[in-house]
């Protein structure tokens, strides 16, 4: 049985490099990881709940992938939290298209970010 491991990382090149080294160390053991990989969550703790930080974080991750072939192979995707309108609201505020959970990028910023990321890739 090959083991799988989950870790929480931040968005920096150094954190991705440290994770890569951690996975390499694990793979040198007698029980290596089945498929070392990471999907970076650009929101939540990485953004400090500041939804617009997802834009910078996403671009930083792509930059890290361009700087290192090993990081490029390790990173399988980004998780960007978006909704129709920017931000969030409390339950009962009745603002159409705004999240009632975590703050999100609105549709327009999400669409722009996806196009920018495609150009960077």
Tell me what each language-model feature is:
Residues 40, 106:
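Conserved, mostly hydrophobic/aromatic
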Residues 47-58, 88-93:
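Short glycine/threonine-rich loop-to-helix capping motif typified by GTGT followed
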Residues 55-68:
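A C-terminal functional module that forms or caps the active site or interfaces directly
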Residues 37-39, 74-79:
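Structural preference for beta-strand elements that scaffold enzyme active sites
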Residues 12-32, 65-67:
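Structured alpha-helical segments in the cores of large, soluble enzyme domains
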Residues 1-9:
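Single conserved hydrophobic/aromatic residue that forms the stacking wall/gate
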Residues 43-47, 78-85:
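Active-site beta-loop-alpha junctions enriched in small/polar residues
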């Amino acid at each position: 049985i090959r083991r799988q491991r989950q870790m929480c990382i931040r968005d920096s090149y150094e954190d991705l490099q440290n994770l890569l080294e951690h996975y390499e160390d694990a793979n040198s053991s007698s029980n290596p990881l089945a498929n070392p990989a990471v999907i970076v969550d650009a929101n939540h703790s990485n953004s400090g709940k500041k939804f617009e930080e997802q834009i910078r974080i996403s671009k930083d991750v792509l930059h890290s992938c361009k700087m290192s072939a090993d990081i490029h192979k390790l990173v399988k995707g980004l998780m960007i939290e978006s909704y129709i309108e920017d931000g969030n609201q409390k339950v009962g505020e009745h603002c159409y298209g705004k999240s009632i959970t975590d703050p999100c990028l609105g549709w327009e910023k999400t669409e722009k970010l996806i196009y920018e990321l495609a150009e960077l890739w």
